[in-house]
Amino acid sequence: MEQPFGSWGWGRSQLGRVAMACALAAGALVGSGAGGLTTAAADPADIAEPAVVRPPDVPTESAPPQPDHLAAARHLKQHKNATPVGTNDFGCRPTAAHPRPVVLAHGTDSTAYSDWSAIGPQLVAAGFCVFALNYGGAPGADTYGTEDLRVSAYQIGQFVDLVLDSTGAAEVDLVGFSQGANVTRYYTNKLGGAAKVDKWIGVASPTYGGVMYGLVPVAQVIPGALDVFAKVTSTAAVQQAQGSPIMLELNAGGDTVPGVRYVTIGSRVDEMIQPFSNIALRGAGAENLVVQDLCPDNLTGHFHMVYDPFVQELVLRALDPEHAPMPTCEPVALGTGIPQVIIAGNS
């Protein structure tokens, strides 16, 4: 297996809504009293194989790179159909140097443009055919990644088939941010996608779920608490809680499958996925990169990952270890990007 980082010498989405959800859920917990214990949280949408899956939305209005989530959100207000410039060009044909199209999957309560406005054009400039979908949206919604993860995984499969049919390629490389990592891995591992996927890259991947600022362990033993959280966030947000049925299902029998090359890119100071060790895959051959192990002074967290230049370069190098330059290590302050995400989520 390629190990593009083994020789190195160096030792998002809508936070405002999540913060509101945490406050409301905490209030519900306080008001509920002792209640009683339950053995496991119910999955909000427990469907093993959906009878009908709406096709994913494919944005087509080319839009410029942005420096952060806030700038992307402001552009989206006037351009709902925005896609990162150069992406979703269905006339693109892979080259010998880059034979596989790259499919980008955004995170929770987000869009292709919100999360990939910077990385998408970088990959296009590097010579890749790049495609980005909007998946997991409720009918009529202008944000995505909120619905059942299993249904979203089927949408990923539909989009991969569209990309392969259009480009003539045999396989794709998948790059998922946050929830996007989970739904692309569900497609790869559980829906037969491995036959069509060469590389899977998870950026800030909630591989084993998160504790949502410490609320999850408490909420899982108080009846109704997760229902409160789901109502003020989304089905998808609750499904990504540590120990949820779908997290257990996704990782049952091993978190990787043969024939696919896996890379995770995580941060020790991820605001949403704690313990941060929940990001790493445990399957044989998976490569788990931690930003601070490679660049100790870079304290980027969950919400800034896709707009951090170092992480962007890690993604490019994971996709193209033979040609991509070595990432440049620069200090990044703790909490970078969070104010922009809060403003974007409440404006």
Q: How does the language model describe each region?
A:
Residues 2-121, 330-337, 342-347:
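Flexible, membrane-associating and regulatory peripheral segments of lipid-active enzymes
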Residues 114, 134-147:
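Glycine-rich "HGGG/HGxG" loop immediately N-terminal to the catalytic nucleophile
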Residues 105-106, 130, 150-251:
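Serine-dependent carboxylesterase/thioesterase catalytic core
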Residues 109, 137-139, 207:
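Alpha/beta-hydrolase active-site loop signature
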Residues 94-98, 124-125, 166-167, 175, ...:
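Extracellular/periplasmic catalytic domains that process cell-envelope and extracellular macromolecules
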Residues 122-140:
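Conserved alpha/beta-hydrolase
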